[in-house]
A protein has these predicted regions:
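Residue-level signal for inorganic ion chemistry
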Residues: 2, 58, 77, 119, ...
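Short histidine/acidic/glycine/proline-rich micro-motifs that form metal-
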Residues: 78-80, 109, 234
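Conserved N-terminal catalytic core of the sugar/cofactor nucleotidyltransferase
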Residues: 1-75, 79-85, 91, 300, ...
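Conserved core of the sugar-phosphate nucleotidyltransferase
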Residues: 83-206, 226, 299
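Short beta-strand segments
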Residues: 21, 72-75, 104-108, 140, ...
Length: 321
């Protein structure tokens, strides 16, 4: 999926201006997946602290190239069917961002999904390159089914794609205003970038950075946020159940990755990285077998895997994450 994300964006942005932020442990994997990417453009996080710190660190690197650059935040685990439309929307969003606005892409919902956050649109601000631009009225975290149904039927709500576009100077100003403690840490890191002390300072400062999402840290509290609705054939492959929609199924509606033998098994996702999985009498289930863990759940509960991840973190079982 990382390779697909690279291929989606390279017709729009030169490779030397594309950066990947990942865990330090995966830097070599990224280099193997995208060997044509400049090594200096792979930024390794010592420790994950959420999307806000990740974006802030990226903005520092981009500011060194161009203080007035427009920055697009994209995610590698998204499936996007219509890449051309995404690139057109990004072009329109970049034009809006030059005015000093924070811009996000809102996905036209095709069902009442409870696994996504929602964006409520406000007044129409403009039309840019054929794309309507609205002021964001409100962000809502993942709703219950009844609320998601109401949102979908209203026509005023979009799924929060997690894709953002803004000027580097704009987002850094928002960090200064809304997350001043983190901004002070960024300034400390910025002073050391490109020097012999860079790694030492980064390790010392990053250990003190607090976890924060970009939605709560910035987007929900910023004053000038715009949304551009898009219909790009989007899925957030953050859920195992999503693979049932994206990958080809057999005659019984099962999506199988790896070795599987099933009896009376229908509508299931079975993913095994190392050994044969056998099932009897399963319907609409997710079975994921990896080297060190096994997940079994109804597909409608697949979004709750994120709750299990939180539980594992609280229990100190980071080796399973």
């Amino acid at each position: 999926m990382l390779q697909e994300a690279w291929e989606r964006i390279t017709p729009f942005v030169p490779s030397e201006k594309i950066f990947v932020v990942t865990s330090e442990a995966y830097i070599d994997v990224v280099r193997q997946q995208i060997p044509q990417m400049p090594a200096a453009n792979i930024i390794g996080e010592l420790e994950g602290h959420g999307k806000a710190p990740c974006i802030g660190l990226s903005a520092l690197h981009l500011r060194q190239l161009d203080p007035e650059a427009v920055m697009a935040v994209l995610t590698a685990d998204h499936y996007i069917e219509r890449a051309d439309e995404l690139r057109r929307a990004l072009g329109a969003a970049a034009q809006v961002a030059t005015e000093g606005r924070l811009v996000t892409l809102g996905i036209q919902p095709n069902r009442p999904a409870t696994g996504y956050g929602y964006i409520e649109r406000g007044e129409k601000l403009a039309q840019v390159s054929g794309h309507d631009v609205y002021r964001v009225k409100k962000f809502t975290e993942k709703p219950d089914l009844a609320t998601a149904q109401a949102f979908t039927e209203s026509g005023r709500y979009y799924w929060n794609s997690g894709m953002f576009i803004w000027k580097v100077s704009t987002i850094l100003h928002e960090f200064e205003k809304l997350m001043p403690q983190f901004y002070a840490q960024l300034i400390e890191i910025d002073a050391a970038l490109g020097t012999a002390e860079e790694q030492v300072v980064l390790e010392r400062v990053w250990a003190k950075v607090e976890n924060e999402t970009i939605d709560y840290g910035i987007m929900e509290r910023a004053e000038d946020v715009a949304v551009i609705p898009v219909d790009i054939g989007w899925s957030d492959v953050g859920s195992w159940a999503t693979l049932l929609e994206l990958l080809p199924a057999d005659a019984e509606g099962n999506v199988i990755v790896g070795q599987h033998i099933g009896l009376d098994t229908k509508g299931c996702l079975v993913h095994s990285s190392r050994r044969l999985v056998t099932t009897i009498g399963l319907e609409d289930m997710v079975v994921v077998d990896t080297e060190d863990a096994l997940l079994v759940c109804p597909k409608e509960r697949a979004q709750d895997v994120k709750k299990l991840v939180d539980m594992l973190k609280e229990m100190g079982k980071d080796e399973y994450l």
